[in-house]
Amino acid sequence: IYLLLLIALGLSSCQQEKTFKVLQFNIWQEGAVVKGGFDAIADEIVRSNADFVTLSEVRNYHQTRFCDRIVEALRQRGQTYYSFYTEDSGLLSRYPITDSTTVYPLNDDRGSMYKAITHIGDTEVALYTAHLDYRNCAYYDARGYDGNTWDEEPPVTNLDTLAICP
């Protein structure tokens, strides 16, 4: 739900197939509200062996740069990742990032989207990460809450209304 991933791998039929692994990770306030949370995030990234990591809830608390801190923590664990400064959502890549763009900037904690360009061999890869505005999540309707005011309202129980696919 938090991830918009677009990958352009124009591999010709004569090339060997290339694969990569992506981890999408909502790090819940950078792990700051859980004892040992930051280290647990770093350990899970290492355990996943992901080539690309997309992050939700990057906050840059106390004027720090979360992506710089996590890249350093991963380096201390023997892993090399690259990143760039973001707010709210973030990207890590095992491959050097050649370009990055803010697609949708964070505004009043209403979500964000970023794009990174990297290369796997001669193939350009575009990776997007998004953290959507939490106030308009569909599951609030089924639970009987307005995501903007938190007022109770009758839950939406009509299956046709809740259905994503016809």
Spans of features found by a protein language model:
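Secretory pathway export signals and precursors
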Residues: 10, 143-145, 161
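N-terminal, active-site-proximal structural segment of metallo-dependent hydrolase catalytic domains
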Residues: 13-76, 86, 150-162
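Structured beta-strand-rich core segments of catalytic domains in phosphoester-bond hydrolases
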Residues: 58-148
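A long, amphipathic alpha-helix that forms part
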Residues: 164-166
